[in-house]
Swiss-Prot record:
GO MF entries: amino acid binding; ornithine carbamoyltransferase activity
Native source species: Bacillus cereus (strain ATCC 10987 / NRS 248)
Name of the gene: arcB
Sorted UniProt keywords: Arginine metabolism, Cytoplasm, Transferase
Family under the similarity heading: Belongs to the aspartate/ornithine carbamoyltransferase superfamily. OTCase family.
Main location group: cytoplasm
Binding residues annotated for L-ornithine, in chain numbering: N170, D230, S234, M235
Pfam families: OTCace, OTCace_N
EC number: 2.1.3.3
GO CC terms in record: cytoplasm
Superkingdom field: Bacteria
UniProt protein name: Ornithine carbamoyltransferase, catabolic
Main function: Reversibly catalyzes the transfer of the carbamoyl group from carbamoyl phosphate (CP) to the N(epsilon) atom of ornithine (ORN) to produce L-citrulline.
Subcellular location: Cytoplasm
Length: 332
């Protein structure tokens, strides 16, 4: 059952902080409805005849696939523009690029590095712009996370979510602020040198004073409903690998940590890709250099009943579809 529909037509989706609790929950309700329609083969062409630009400065599997399928399901035409196709800030300014794309497309997705780039696209294009990831925020991921949590835990309010790992990255920032907005008990567990920026902590505390930032694993995971982790090194930070392995090894999600929650129904989430074995070239390289067969999560946890990572990956598509439909679609 959809809650009262807020008017989001024409809005850009750049960060969770730009939306109220009611608006974020509406995105989740709409995503659940669209997920059900897709499952039952019910057409939902809310973007019939629209053209959508998909700008990718950073490579992607899930984000690109999710936006492409979401566009197609909604009746829109997606146009992929990769790193070699766009000249943002090189041969053409972001402002000029935004103005050109806004004349040709009805909506723009951007996945890249600087958050200022997606803000400039939104400011200058005249069409809704959706953030597929920047160094600061990853809001489409957080919506998928929240939908997955609601499906498996049954609610969001007062749910204890523990993010373990690099607390300064975009996923941690978005979970901290987005989770606080919807009333969750968010805990970031990481070494002090990797705590979120103070401005992000302060922003989260505006919505929920209960947020916890700690380096103590036992304290963080006690009674947790959700354990969440991400890669130890983000794209563009590869030179920090040895340092991060040393820092974050005690924060690996393993069965000992799962048991320390005291909750046999605790769920495990990861935005993927996850380094839980040596079945990739990257995994082999890490094993050769550092002797680690598993990194941020053990294979045992990744493949266990606790793991909901593939539901979470699928939900990227449904939540992205909801964001595009609500901000660009004909929802009457």
């Amino acid at each position: 059952m959809l809650m009262t529909r807020p008017n989001l037509k024409g809005r850009s989706f750049l960060a969770e902080k730009d939306f109220t609790q009611e608006e974020l929950l509406y995105f989740l309700d709409l995503a659940a409805e669209l997920k059900e329609k897709k499952k039952n083969g019910i057409p939902h062409h809310y973007l019939e005849g629209k053209n959508v630009a998909l700008l990718f400065e950073k490579t992607s599997t899930r984000t690109r696939c999710a936006f492409t399928v979401a566009c197609t399901d909604l009746g829109a035409n997606p146009e992929y523009l990769g790193k070699s196709d766009i000249q943002l800030g090189k041969k053409e300014s972001v402002e000029d690029t935004a103005k050109v794309l806004g004349r040709m497309f009805d909506g723009i997705e951007f996945r890249g590095f600087n958050h200022e780039t997606v803000e400039s696209l939104a400011q200058n294009s005249g069409v809704p712009v959706w953030n597929g990831l920047t160094d600061m925020w990853h809001p489409t991921q957080t919506l998928a996370d929240l939908l997955t949590i609601r499906e498996h835990v049954g609610k969001l309010k007062n749910v204890k979510l523990v993010y373990v790992g690099d607390g300064r990255n975009n996923v941690a920032n978005s979970l901290l602020v987005g989770g606080a907005i919807v009333g969750m008990d968010v805990r970031i567990c990481t070494p002090e040198t990797l705590w979120p920026a103070q401005e992000v902590i302060d922003l989260a505390k505006k919505y929920n004073e209960q947020v916890m930032i700690t380096s103590n694993v036992e304290e963080a995971v006690a009674n947790a409903d959700v354990i969440y982790t991400d890669v130890w090194v983000s794209m563009g930070e590869e030179e920090k690998f040895a340092e991060r392995v040393k820092l974050l090894k005690p924060y690996q999600v393993n069965m000992k940590m799962i048991k320390e929650t005291g909750n046999e129904n605790v769920i495990f989430l990861h935005c993927l890709p996850a380094f839980h074995d040596v079945e990739t070239m990257y995994g082999e390289e890490v094993y050769e250099k550092y002797g680690l067969k598993e990194m941020e999560v053990t294979d045992e946890v990744f493949r266990s009943k606790h793991s909901k990572v593939f539901d979470q990956a699928e939900n990227r598509m449904h939540t992205i579809k909801a964001v595009m439909a609500a901000t660009l679609g004909n929802m009457e």
